[in-house]
């Protein structure tokens, strides 16, 4: 049976933290693939607060370029109208792919919020949650015995941080793949400072 991890999020924008989580999940849970699942309208946000579906999808494609044998994109939530709930996505995917064992990848901060998730008991019975925790940090959750808890690399990077740095005119290089960074500047996302130039590969000269 194929083992596929689901990594949901707004990916606004996708960054190195997302890629590291996906890579570590493949290693720790012996996954065949990780599917990035960009949400349409997340339950806790409004539509105008996030970049368009087309822009976020384009950035994910650039982020996983060259790694398509391990990373893929599932657009099921972008195609669904209204707010996106994980339980609806899992129900659809398990029905469509009965020969796949699904894992759902979450960060340590989300482990604590699991009791508030819609249909959490059904989710726990249907998929295996992979919860990443920071080294030395104890997680307090009534469901922690039902999760696969692993210690992953600690990367203090978030999409919010990147957007804020953009609005402040600060560099975002090395926080996300170069192709994603270029796309952000080319499309003028996140109120980019027009005086800043899009990153480019510097040319080296021989002496």
Curated annotation (Swiss-Prot):
Gene3D superfamilies reported in the protein's UniProt record: HUPs (3.40.50.620)
Source domain of life: Bacteria
Record EC number: 2.7.7.18
Listed GO biological process terms: NAD biosynthetic process
InterPro entries to which the protein is assigned, alphabetical: Cyt_trans-like (IPR004821), NadD/NMNAT (IPR005248), Rossmann-like_a/b/a_fold (IPR014729)
GO molecular function, one term: nicotinate-nucleotide adenylyltransferase activity
Enzyme class: transferase
CDD domains: NMNAT
Entry annotated with the keyword Isomerase: no
Reactions mediated catalytically: nicotinate beta-D-ribonucleotide + ATP + H(+) = deamido-NAD(+) + diphosphate
Family annotation (Pfam families): CTP_transf_like (PF01467)
Transmembrane regions listed in the UniProt entry: none
Pathway membership, UniProt: Cofactor biosynthesis; NAD(+) biosynthesis; deamido-NAD(+) from nicotinate D-ribonucleotide: step 1/1
Keywords tagged on the record: ATP-binding, NAD, Nucleotide-binding, Nucleotidyltransferase, Pyridine nucleotide biosynthesis, Transferase
PANTHER family given in the database record: NICOTINATE-NUCLEOTIDE ADENYLYLTRANSFERASE-RELATED (PTHR39321), PHOSPHOPANTETHEINE ADENYLYLTRANSFERASE (PTHR39321:SF3)
Known function: Catalyzes the reversible adenylation of nicotinate mononucleotide (NaMN) to nicotinic acid adenine dinucleotide (NaAD).
Similarity field: Belongs to the NadD family.
Protein's name according to its UniProt entry: Probable nicotinate-nucleotide adenylyltransferase
Organism of this sequence: Halalkalibacterium halodurans (strain ATCC BAA-125 / DSM 18197 / FERM 7344 / JCM 9153 / C-125)
